[in-house]
Design a protein with these regions (language model features):
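Hydrophobic faces of well-ordered beta-strands that scaffold small-molecule active sites
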Residues: 137, 181, 196-200
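Histidine-centered divalent-metal-coordination microenvironment in nucleic-acid enzymes
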Residues: 146-153, 188-205
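A long, hydrophobic alpha-helical segment
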Residues: 179-189
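Short C-terminal domain-edge/linker segments immediately following a structured domain
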Residues: 103-109, 169-170, 181-183
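Active-site microenvironments that recognize anionic phosphate/pyrophosphate groups
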Residues: 1-161
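Intrinsically disordered, low-complexity Ser/Thr/Pro/Gly-rich regulatory segments
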Residues: 158-159, 163-179, 194, 203-205
Length: 205
């Protein structure tokens, strides 16, 4: 996370609707069409530069057919920036309670960021219920595929693959039938935010 990102993101957050206004407009549109609602929300996140379209354009995509005749696609994500040396040094000397707890927690919404911390002042998260639990829905700033979105538990709990995971995926698919949705592995060896915070991912393909 660079100082340029931390400085630029608040500037793109001046005109868009506030988080509460965003939720209100989104759910009004959901009453008519889930696809129109996500189209509006995605366009908002592109226009306020939370979804980094210019950076995403650098990604490399290989498409082809396997020996069995199945479609195959490999994506190399070149859009997500590496931490600069200052960010690494600042993170190494950080003390006290971690805030936000992880890159997916809801307190990232509106967070101004800093060295070693993601700039999220222009982040918008849609509040929703999945299988009776409060969850959130947002787009990934550095997408691997079209309209790459993240569904996350509003509570900071570790990811676990079980029967509830399948129930959640079905509930999400019913809510947004024009999107596909899947889940990461919950293997401890995978050192990423997908393990420390319960979530699923989806999008268009």
């Amino acid at each position: 996370v660079t100082s340029r990102e931390v400085q630029n993101d608040p500037l793109t957050d001046i005109a868009p609707p506030t988080p509460s206004e965003t939720n209100s407009i989104f759910w009004q549109k959901m009453e008519k069409s889930s696809e129109k609602a996500t189209d509006w929300f995605y366009k908002l996140c592109v226009n306020n530069n939370y979804v980094k379209k210019e950076a995403i354009a650098r990604n490399v995509v290989f498409s082809g057919t396997s020996s069995k005749g199945h479609g195959l696609e490999i994506t190399i994500n070149l859009s997500k920036p590496e931490k600069d040396p200052k960010a690494i040094a600042a993170a190494a000397h950080a003390t006290g309670k971690k805030y936000p707890q992880c890159a997916l927690c809801l307190e990232n919404e509106g967070y101004l960021g800093g060295y070693g911390k993601n700039a999220r002042s222009n982040l918008r998260i849609i509040r929703m219920n999945i299988a009776g639990r409060p969850w959130g829905f947002q787009y990934s700033p550095y997408a691997y595929f079209n309209e790459h979105c993240i569904f996350l538990d509003q509570k900071h709990i570790p990811m676990v693959i079980n029967q509830q995971t399948l129930i959640n995926l079905v509930e999400i698919e019913k809510t947004f039938p024009h999107y596909f949705v899947g889940s990461n592995a919950d293997l401890p060896i995978v050192r990423s935010s997908s393990v420390v915070h319960e979530r699923s991912q989806g999008g268009r393909h």
